[in-house]
Amino acid sequence: GNKNNAGAPLKVLAYDKPKDPTKKWKTSLVCEFLHNSHNFHPVNWDKDIEEELLITGQEGTWHLDRKKDGTWNRKVVSEEFGGEVRDGLTPDGERIVATIEPRHGSKVVCYRKNGNNWQRIVLDTTFKDGHALACADFLDTGGDQVVAGWRGMNPRAVPGVKLFVPKNKDYTEWETHQLSGAEIAVEDLKAADLNEDGKPDIIVAGRQTHNLKIFWNES
């Protein structure tokens, strides 16, 4: 078993859809090495049509890619305990990975691909119960920015949403903009162009505050 995030690791399973979806779905093992994993994110970083997974947990953030034999390759992005994970691109097409660390944590972090390694840039250390992330080009700069939210449930604090904007093309310097505060305790958020004006908007859901808020992108 597993107690206090030690012992048997969790299992991540893939479900294969049968021709008749009302029948039993077969499962296959994706990975079995993480403890206290809180989030994963589908990506497509290679040239095939199949998606891969970014997953984060106590053992860090990992990229998982399914091979032809059904097993999965894994490559580490970071060994820091992560709770949320999303990916994005710089204007030059370089990949970034954004995380909240640790689970329900205080840090917002951006990892930038640097050769075979990932450079870690800490964007914020003041979150209380960080719980949501998205990467998108909200400002039409040609590269993605990071939006992140926190709940303020444990420890108790005023919740909020912040937008993090890179100040240079290397994504090593950032500026921060506060978007909201106590009105919504962020359980999750998404980026999507809701009014089809070509600009991603931000949809934020609050569980503790029982509300939903849309930040319309008027930039």
Residue ranges of predicted features:
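Beta-propeller-forming repeat regions
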Residues: 1-219
